[in-house]
């Protein structure tokens, strides 16, 4: 099944709306005729492959990059649409007072600043780590909580992107919603972002000796990494995720109640008094991520470049994700019995993915 976005007739863009600088930036000079951009008969400018309602794969089925997940077929405008999406991704004009763009957080073509944000969309105090979105089209859902499923939910008026980045002064302060064309172009650009590949392997792509030792630890059933992150490091299509949500001990509401080190919550009275609004520790959960214990299993591809880690950015380094200093003991892999050198070898293997 394919959904086609067409421009033409009543939907075509008039030349008076398009600024010369934007046209030049998009590389679409020459596509403009006397009637408008893409004037004349409707033309297919994007074809997105869709299917039945997306369902998480079973753990016995390693998740891999689909052979054909997204493609623009028989379209002379693919590159222009992606480049227009890149313009939108880096353009702050659509936000309130031009304060920031997508690239402000997902900089350098979809990578992450590693910063943690409290955007207030799920209750003050719901810290969220900036997600690494390269290769994101291969691995829904698109939020830490796993609330969105099908890859194409990210497209459309009720999509996760339009909802998460919607016309809401409590989130990214966008002054208006994206038009269908702008949203489609943005999605095409995001879908075009591929994994970078690890620079930590040998020159021929093979694993170093430390990485080989780390692989044995990673695949050891006693450690359990493969239970949630299945994949072969020599398979370029492997994603190292079971596409499920799990409780790895990072939620504030733990198995036996509150965690021993609950986070700081927003205090409006302190803010009004000119004090640090997050200066007070509290055992009282609030709406949003504080009431969630299970979070989406991320891909381990490009994991070296996607820190900080966990949904709240609680782990600054890869070592912090496995040495039981951030999450509850042995809830994120069973690593408490490993020696320091074994932990370091495991980190080296992760950096190779």
From Swiss-Prot:
EC number: 1.7.2.7
EC category name: oxidoreductase
Cofactor(s) this protein cannot do without: heme c
Inducers of expression: Is among the most highly expressed proteins in the proteome.
Binding site for Ca(2+) 2: 129, 306-308
Region forming the signal peptide: 1-39
Residues holding Ca(2+) 3: 139, 141, 296
SUPFAM superfamilies: Cytochrome c
UniProt binding sites for heme c 1: 102, 105-106, 165
Keyword field: Calcium, Heme, Iron, Metal-binding, Oxidoreductase, Signal
Main location: other
Binding site for Ca(2+) 1: 118-119, 122-123, 126
InterPro entries membership: Cyt_c-like_dom, Cyt_c-like_dom_sf, Cytochrome_c_Peroxidase/MauG
Pathway terms, separated by semicolons: Nitrogen metabolism
Cofactor note: Binds two heme c groups per subunit. Heme 1 appears to be in the active site, whereas heme 2 probably functions in electron transfer.
Annotated localization: Anammoxosome
Binding positions for heme c 2 per the UniProt entry: 225, 228-229, 332
One GO CC term on file: anammoxosome
GO molecular function, one term: cytochrome-c peroxidase activity
Superkingdom in the source lineage: Bacteria
Domain Cytochrome c: 209-353
Catalyzed reactions per annotation: hydrazine + 3 Fe(III)-[cytochrome c] + H2O = nitric oxide + 3 Fe(II)-[cytochrome c] + NH4(+) + 2 H(+)
Function: Component of the hydrazine synthase complex that catalyzes the condensation of nitric oxide (NO) with ammonium to form hydrazine. The gamma subunit catalyzes the first half-reaction, i.e. the three-electron reduction of nitric oxide to hydroxylamine; it may obtain electrons from the triheme cytochrome c kuste2854.
Subunit structure: Part of the hydrazine synthase complex that forms an elongated dimer of heterotrimers composed of one alpha, one beta and one gamma subunit.
Domain notes: Consists of two alpha-helical lobes, each of which contains one c-type heme.
Name this protein carries in UniProt: Hydrazine synthase subunit gamma
Organism name: Kuenenia stuttgartiensis
